[in-house]
Structures are given as structure tokens and as C-alpha cells.
């Protein structure tokens, strides 16, 4: 298996995997612990086989979550949605158990039709119109609705 | 006007066909360009005419000054006006979307002036319309033509605003959280050398995003506890209306409203050059006895809406 271990190897148990490996699909790692179920909910379709690891030990984050989806690679829209709720997560594409691509979730400049504006009086919540939010700060992730011009932390947004 | 001589030379500015949605869309040069043209409009030195042009006023919310002054400005330029001032009498009542209303009106008129209760409605309209959209107020968000006239008023009173020869002290008082005029004016003032004093009841303070923008732009910003303290040290006192519905407890509103009311007695000993502005309508926050003092400038400010809106209409329709 060429997948990277989720935990730093230790001398007593160098390659312990805390969430079952997958043959083909996508692994989302380094998810902030409290966002793990949200990420799984966001990514999983009805018939997907999903493995979830919560509160796993992480050298970088202390505790983290991992979500593995078998048989599917993420499209651009799903990656944008992931960027909004878990901007520090890493994504590995798995084919025949091998990591063929690994990257940090790309942060778009603009979130388009990804989340509902948190301002209840924003026109996009009342007209049939696409929501558009510009990223104005990466950490903590903060966006500005280009319609109502209000700034929001990403944590206040509801995904569409 | 004196302030023109002190304004920095502005680069060529392209306005034809442009929407006026948010003051954030305008550079310092743009702002000065509009003020310069408004000055020429006021002194009848501009040849701009809009004969044969039609302005549609879509007022989904009530308005007195904005609608009347846009209409007056259009008539003065030789143009004509169509529109409504009550959304209840339009197809909106039947469920027509804003987008569809705009797609129709853009075929009737050469420019659209719009007020709408939803934040961001003007931006949405501008993405659809092929004719310029001028935002006459979108919910609690923006009211750029008011900001242009506020800036014009301040620059007429204090040419130093544009020349930068002296740092002006401008105080905002009242509801700074929900008041769109103070948000827009603060955004515009970020282009100039200004010290800002803020006086607001607890819970109605200026939102952080505007404070951060002001500080980032290099403005000195201070929160001051009482109105009386800013009277003694300001060039401009910009009052806004406190709205009772913002206060969960009516008793608290009753108490607060007296603390944010300026009276003639409070102006005894104020610097002679202090001028009080207000976007109007005022309710209780400026006592009627202030009107007779030399500090009252809010009606003159409202009058400045005509040349400023003449300038905006002429610019976006390419008449100058």
C-alpha cells in the first residue's frame, strides 16, 4: 500500500491505519475535528461507501478527521464547497490503492452558488439569483457577498 | 467654487454607461470628477443636456428627497421621467421577479434609478440592465448618490477635504450600525485625510468591517462616549436617525434618544465653523431650535442633491 499513514509512524507500530484503506476514490484528510461529519454529509451521495475517522491523532493539528469515499473523485464544485467548510483539508485521489494526486483544497477567489448569504435581507435570499461571495481573508476564512457587501466568517454560511 | 482649485488633477475618468451601485466602486479620481461636474452644474456652467432621454424611477420603497431630487435633476437637464413610487401598484405584487422587471424597464428608459428594500438589489439589477442603473438605496446597504452629495457638501464647506491641507474632523452620531449613509460616507472618506469621531449607543456601533477599512486607509478613528464631547472638536457633525424598532426594550430607546439629541443649548461655545449634516428625515435627534443656528446645514445639504444628481445622470448617459 502506498497511501500515506494518517498518523506519524511510531517505533512500536509504524504503519497503523486508523481508517480503512480504499481501492479507488478520494481521501479528505486534516479536517478540523468538529467539521468531520459535516464534510462527510457534504460529500457523500446516497449510494457512496464512506469511511469516517473522527478525533484521530495528528502531529499537525492535534486532533483531526478523515473522510474516505470509495469509487468517486471530487468535481470542482464539490472542492469549492469543501474549501468553504474545511479550508485546511488535504485531498488525495486514490487509484488502485495508490495516491495519484495529493493537494490542499484549492481556495477559489469567488464562491459562486456554493453557499447562501448569511444576511437574511440579502437580495440573493429573496430572488432566484446565484449567490456570489469573494474571499477577502484566507485564515480565518472570511468572505464578502458581492451583492449586500457584508463580510462573513465562512462558519456562518449555509451550503447550498 | 473654491474647492476646485485645490482638488488634485484627476486622470481621465470613463463614466458613460457606468452603473452607480456602490461607493466602493469609485476611485478618488472618480469622486472628485463627480464633485467637479456638480460644481459646474450648480453654477450653470455645464452645457450637458439630456433632451429626449428618459429616466425610469423604480421606487419599491417610499422616498421623498431621493426620488424628487432625481426627477428635478432630470427635468432641469431637459429629460423626461417615468416610474412608480409604490411597489404595491406594480407586477411585483403579482410575484414578478426583480430581474424580470429590470429586463422590461431597460427597454423603456435610458437610465434606471432604483430604490429597493433588499440589500444588493441594485447590484443584481446592474448585472441585468444594459442601461445604467443608479442605486437610490438598497436596504441597509448603500446609497451612493447620497454619499456623493454628502461629500460635495463637505467639500464646499471645507475645501481642505480635497486639498489635504488640513485633517478634517468629522463626527458620526446615532445609529452607526444600520445607517447605510454613514457606511457609504465612511467608505468614501477613506480616500481623504480625515479624523473620524464615532458616537453611538451600545449595540448600534459602527460595524467592524467599516472600522477596519477606515484604519487600513490610514484614518484616525475614535469612539467618543457623548455627543457634547464631539461638538467642541468637530468640523462636521453628521447626525443619523435612531429607529425605535432597533431597540428590544422601549424604555431603553426612550432613555437613549435623549442622549443622542442635539439642541441649540449644546451648541453654545461650539467652534463657529462647525456644521451639522443629516441625510434627513430627522425626527427627534436634531431639535428644531438648531435650525436657526449658523451650524444647521442639513437643508442646504439636501439642496445639493440636485447638482450632484444632475452630474451623475449626465455622466452615466454620456452627456459630458
Region annotations inferred by a language model:
Chain A
Residues 1-12, 150-160:
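N-terminal charge/polar-biased segments
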